[in-house]
């Protein structure tokens, strides 16, 4: 009886002029699978993820063209600073964008984020020197603060039974963007050299050899911006009064202890929310590893065999990463949701991290192969690493968004984005320095060459796995 009365209260307290209430009504009346909403969330996240790592397959050659590195072994050092500038910019603005999303809505932040890709990613492709590349990447990161708000949006636009799938779509699009982005960079960079029959050296793509992949992503971002202008706003623009259904439902609760928890959570700040903070810390460790791995993989694949690399071209790297993205898409859309329901997000994260360490341990051995054996092995390892890494991140997405109320999700995701961006800014810079150092110690007695690089990656990953255990990682009961 109480449940029926609660439903009536909820039905009567929709606000006619509130965009969030309209979305809630739409969710109640909707029947069937929300294909369009899933598609829009997916392409928005993909749009913001593509430029993050699209530069890595050609960054080695871009730094070489800038003539800033005195020796070949120093290219990785300078590449790390260009790679980290995006995340450094995002670290400075993520909390601000989260607060804007909670105050003015998710949609404005999403539109600004997609539009920033159109402008600054295009300018990056036209970079004339090292500092222009750093500044345009920094600006791109500063204005691209939509990942936190889009996670909140994904929780709010879907019914409860589809929220797990929604966050899986976010992490899938994010993971695929981080993989397909480099594939685009690999296939389209230096087009006058790779496809001389289509592009001449005298064309704009010959004068700016890294402009085409940036332009392709910017065109996609422009189309996504148009689509994003049609999405509904999910943030409620009214305040609850004492006679609103929220308080009525609170009085109807059969569990007085849950009321105390709700009051306590409402009064406490986000920084005192340990389930949120602990999941953010673990998320940061995995993010640092993920970004460092993304840069190291491309540098390792591009570097000469005499330094323990694969000697791959940008197109070769693009092929490997394209297969990785396809494998990740199949797994996330077909198997991840079952694994998450069966094991829970924490166990999925823990198992994924542990298996990823095994895969990474094989990378130095892969460099000893050649021909078809090398191609098959490195592609399989890349697919496995991508699936495991994205599965771990998805579990942490779910934990973060379940740890807070709707009106706190933008700020909570902003905090997560700031912390994650700082760690991801450290990742490429540290990875570039360590990779450059490893190339100079080929004859070392302990973990020579790239063996040291992958060992350090595994140490970071092991730390993330350890932090998923109690008492450190707490799971909310909401």
UniProtKB/Swiss-Prot annotation:
GO cellular component: plant-type vacuole membrane; plasma membrane
Tissue specificity: Predominantly expressed in roots and stomatal guard cells. Detected in anther stamen filaments and shoot apical meristem. In the mature portion of roots, restricted to the cortex. At the root tip, highly expressed in both the cortical and epidermal cell layers of the apical meristem and the transition zone, while absent from the quiescent center or the columella cells. Not detected in lateral root primordia.
Induction: By 2,4-D treatment.
Presence of keyword Transport: yes
Keyword Transmembrane: yes
InterPro entries: MFS, MFS_dom, MFS_trans_sf, Tet-R_TetA/multi-R_MdtG-like
Loss of function: phenotype: No visible phenotype when grown under normal conditions. No visible phenotype when grown in presence of zinc. Hypersensitivity to drought stress and auxin-related defects.
Alphabetical GO biological process terms: basipetal auxin transport; gravitropism; regulation of stomatal closure; response to water deprivation; root development
One Gene Ontology MF term: solute:potassium antiporter activity
Record field: transmembrane: 43-63, 81-101, 108-128, 130-150, 169-189, 208-228, 280-300, 317-337, 346-367, 378-398, 415-435, 453-473
CDD domains according to UniProt: MFS_SLC46_TetA_like
Membrane topology recorded in Swiss-Prot or TrEMBL: Multi-pass membrane protein
Family stated for the protein in its record: Belongs to the major facilitator superfamily.
Additional information: Heterologous expression of ZIFL1 in yeast leads to increased resistance to 2,4-dichlorophenoxyacetic acid (2,4-D), indole-3-acetic acid (IAA), aluminum and thallium. Not involved in zinc stress resistance.
Function: Major facilitator superfamily (MFS) transporter probably involved in 2,4-dichlorophenoxyacetic acid (2,4-D) export. K(+) may be the physiological substrate of the transporter.
Identification of the protein by name: Protein ZINC INDUCED FACILITATOR-LIKE 1
Native source organism of the sequence: Arabidopsis thaliana (Mouse-ear cress)
Top-level taxonomy: Eukaryota, Viridiplantae, Streptophyta, Embryophyta, Tracheophyta
